[in-house]
């Protein structure tokens, strides 16, 4: 164990192979293993309800409420301030960028997502297999599945669409708003 910072790994009882650096980093972690938590309150609730293993959370509040309420969070990489903040029990996610995959509230269990960029997929809750790369790409996705968006604000309003592809600045920007769905749609270029 390596704990540097006020109340870093504060609650540890039977954990090993963890690194926590920063104010209250890994604060609630009790028995989880193989986690790297760097930043103020990074992984703060990790290990609260069950054993969460093999996570990397770097940035202030990155993964702050992971494992806060229900199940364990495993195999996640959250890099950036607030990346994956409310991702309660999601597994195998990669969120890179400020507010990437931030989510809201507890009970979020998105799995197997790749969200890269400032606020990429920031509203995600239970969506799975989402790929979003770009500034606010897939910004509003909550429960969508298997969508791919590449570009500035691509699929911005697509909350629940499935299997859509958007490539380009604002590609598919309006779909998902006002009852529209981006189910199986393909958007190329700017809109």
Model regions: which residues?
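Glycine- and small/polar-enriched repetitive beta-structure motifs of secreted/surface proteins
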Residues: 1-191
